[in-house]
Swiss-Prot record:
Entry annotated with the keyword rRNA-binding: yes
Protein name: Large ribosomal subunit protein uL2
GO CC terms, sorted: large ribosomal subunit
Designated gene of the protein: rplB
Keywords: Ribonucleoprotein, Ribosomal protein, RNA-binding, rRNA-binding
Biological source species: Photobacterium profundum (strain SS9)
GO molecular function, a single term: rRNA binding
UniProt-listed GO biological process terms: cytoplasmic translation
Length: 275
């Protein structure tokens, strides 16, 4: 995998930094694992914008990813690595010994031809999926379940991982990239290793059009809007907004706590905001 900085042959190329991976499949994706992906333009069933900054972009198919890894005891061969427009991580097409193919999140260090497996008795090896009670303390994992059998929810994006730092009774304690330490049932599954494509964070789109290809519309500052559109809007000439920064709906936007899920607070051993 290489980082390529484009030559300034035009204003649109001047700032482009690409992540080039020669190991990715050049052809079409595996059709039986594709689904239609409709665009909403950020609008709801009334036609009103409910999510800003969404619209346009290239057509995409959704790739059906196996986040549960429930084919226990059946070895699988990694056929190829592929680009997935729906996520920052790359994906791997794996062929199981019984003939079934599935997509999984591609772990770092896994390449075409490697063998992987899932289940209680799977080896402690990058790409294998096991219940966390069978994974040694200190191991790095990704694609972590929060509820047994629900499928992976934590550490799924490019370069992400969690570390198992303790095992107490029916729970393991994970340290996440954010600094949060969290208890998760030891019956939950996780995949060994970390997610690949960690260079994703180094890319530079280089021009506005590259964001538009991805379906991302411009973000306009509140201070340049009218009072009807934003709490910071209006005023004669250029203003500073006249109040502490808030969202378009008046919610403080710098350092204001918005977490309201008290039900799961008991599982958080250490907050990501604690220094």
């Amino acid at each position: 995998m290489a980082i390529v900085k484009c030559k300034p042959t035009s204003p649109g190329r001047r700032h482009v930094v690409k992540v080039v991976n020669s190991d990715l499949h050049k052809g079409k994706p595996y059709a039986p694992l594709l689904e239609k992906k409709s665009k909403s333009g950020g609008r709801n069933n009334n036609g009103r914008i409910t999510v800003r900054h969404i619209g346009g972009g290239n057509k995409q198919h959704y790739r059906l990813i196996d986040f549960k890894r429930t084919k226990d005891g059946i070895p699988a061969k990694v056929e190829r690595l592929e680009y997935d427009p729906n996520r920052s991580a790359n994906i791997a097409l794996v062929l199981y010994a019984d003939g079934e193919r599935r997509y999984i999140i591609a772990p770092k260090g896994v390449s075409a031809g490697d063998m992987i497996q899932s289940g209680e008795d799977a080896a402690i090896k990058v790409g294998n999926t096991l219940p966390m009670r069978n994974i040694p303390v200190g191991s790095t994992v990704h694609c972590v379940e929060l509820k047994p059998g629900k499928g992976a929810q934590l550490a799924r994006s490019a370069g992400a991982y969690a570390q198992i730092i303790a095992r107490t009774g029916t729970y393991v304690t994970l340290r996440l990239r954010s600094g949060e330490m969290r208890k998760v049932l030891s019956e939950c599954r996780a995949t060994l290793g970390e997610v690949g494509n960690s260079e994703h964070m180094l890319r530079e789109l280089g021009k506005a059009g590259a964001s538009r290809w991805r379906g991302i519309r411009p973000t306009v500052r509140g201070v340049v809007m009218n009072p009807v559109d934003h709490p910071h809007g209006g005023g004669e000439g250029r203003t500073s907004g006249g109040r502490h920064p808030v969202s378009p709906w008046g919610v403080p936007t710098k350092g204001y706590k918005t977490r309201s899920n008290k039900r799961t607070d008991k599982y958080i051993v250490r907050s990501r905001n604690k220094k």
